[in-house]
């Protein structure tokens, strides 16, 4: 009876039978052929969910409720289906309650199986979320729990991940002669892969910098390089660290196609001298009471993608009342609901205005980004590192 009352239909390949978001009440049983089930995601792309062949079925939810379709269903090859809509189901029930009861029972069985699969997916998602949370805590442990506190200086960090884990990172380490290593990096992409690479990057930079700097100090103490100045040691440490890091990544991890932008520096607190390397990173800005003084442009390419490249070392002296602000492109590229970016010009305009502290500057930029993005999902990690030399009265 079902075969005679239901509509039998034949479709060519490429015909859209169910449209995601449409409200329809037709249940399909595949007699011959195959269909593809897919779901629309961001930017007009589709994610393939399943391919159903003869004996498969779809659209059962639409037969019993009035909710939109959850996916698109398109014929993969010429396909023959039975189509059962709400009116057909009602006629079957009226003509033969037994067949109607059996059909309803089968549809309910399908729904029950879907509920079981959904519950299983929920449990798997919860397990994955727990693993991500563990990863977040481990990643958090790679970041310094507190920024260094130095007489006459203020060092502030801010990291706001776009997801559970982040591809951005920062670091600050005080050497035993009071000079300070400062690092800000941005790994390409987002998510777990970027987070793993972030951990590797941070570990390499810290380990190589500490090794090279302490090697210079031992040489000075042993009189092997008596003429070598502290400034030369700072510059050489930066250059050797980035060369070793880039070499290690390109030799051992080139197949990952992962790389990072990297700004890192060593600060000499007594004089305000800063030696730095900028590996393809957004140029940090030096700003003071009279606005922006300069930007610290790239001294070499991205790190981890091109072997055997060279990096120059830049230098600058921070005067009292000046702040050096480094930030990732998540700041300039923060987007609102209409996909309009916050923009570099807006950041520069904020930096022209003086602030009483590095913390106030970072908070003012953060507040401006929040006002711009409002309820839009965060598109990228947002990270800032601010170093301010206090005026004599504030030391």
Name each model-derived stretch.
Residues 1, 69, 87-120, 231:
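A small-molecule sensor/coupling module
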Residues 1-45, 164:
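Regulatory nucleotide-sensing modules
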Residues 7, 16, 34-39, 57, ...:
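Short beta-strand segments in beta-sandwich/barrel cores
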Residues 12-13, 31-32, 53, 77, ...:
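A cytosolic small-molecule/anion-sensing beta-strand core signal
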Residues 22, 120-325, 374-395:
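… and, occasionally, acidic/histidine-rich disordered N-termini of signaling adaptors
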Residues 37-38, 60, 71-75, 92, ...:
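Short beta-strand His + acidic residue motifs that chelate non-heme Fe in jelly-roll/DSBH
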Residues 43-58, 318:
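Short acidic-glycine-tyrosine-enriched beta hairpin
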Residues 64-87, 98:
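Ligand-binding loop in jelly-roll beta-barrel domains
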């Amino acid at each position: 009876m079902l075969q005679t009352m239901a509509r039998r239909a034949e479709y060519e390949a490429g015909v859209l039978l169910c449209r995601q978001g449409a409200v329809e009440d037709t249940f399909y049983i595949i007699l011959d052929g195959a269909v593809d089930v897919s779901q629309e995601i961001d930017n007009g792309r589709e994610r393939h969910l399943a391919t159903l062949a003869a004996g498969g079925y779809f659209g059962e939810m639409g037969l019993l409720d009035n909710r939109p379709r959850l996916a698109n269903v398109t014929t993969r090859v010429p396909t023959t289906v039975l189509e059962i809509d709400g009116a057909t189901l009602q006629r079957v029930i009226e003509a033969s309650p037994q067949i109607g009861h059996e059909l309803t029972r089968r549809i309910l069985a399908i729904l029950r199986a879907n509920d079981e699969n959904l519950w299983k997916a929920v449990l798997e998602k919860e397990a994955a979320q727990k693993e991500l949370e563990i990863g977040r805590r481990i990643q958090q442990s790679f970041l310094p729990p507190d920024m260094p506190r130095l007489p006459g200086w203020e060092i502030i960090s801010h990291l706001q991940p776009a997801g559970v884990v982040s591809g951005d990172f920062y670091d600050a380490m005080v050497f035993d002669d009071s000079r300070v290593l400062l690092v800000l990096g941005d790994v390409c992409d987002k998510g777990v892969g970027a987070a793993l690479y972030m951990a590797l990057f941070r570990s390499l930079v810290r380990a190589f910098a500490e090794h090279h700097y302490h090697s210079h100090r031992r040489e000075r103490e042993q009189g092997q390089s008596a003429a070598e100045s502290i400034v030369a040691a700072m510059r050489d440490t930066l250059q050797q660290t980035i060369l070793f890091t880039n070499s290690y990544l390109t030799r051992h991890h080139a197949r990952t196609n992962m790389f990072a932008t990297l700004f890192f520096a060593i600060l000499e607190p007594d004089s305000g001298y800063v030696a730095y390397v900028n590996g393809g990173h957004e140029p940090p800005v030096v700003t003071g009471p009279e606005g922006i003084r300069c930007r610290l442009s790239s001294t070499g390419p991205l790190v981890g993608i091109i072997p055997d490249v060279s990096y120059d070392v830049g230098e600058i002296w921070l005067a009292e009342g000046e702040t050096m602000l480094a930030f990732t492109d998540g700041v300039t590229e923060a987007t609102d609901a209409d996909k309009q970016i916050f923009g570099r010009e807006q950041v520069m305009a904020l930096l022209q205005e003086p602030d009483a502290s590095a913390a106030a500057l970072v908070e003012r930029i953060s507040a401006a980004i929040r006002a711009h993005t409002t309820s839009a999902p965060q598109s990228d990690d947002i990270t800032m590192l601010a170093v301010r030399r206090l005026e004599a009265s504030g030391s």
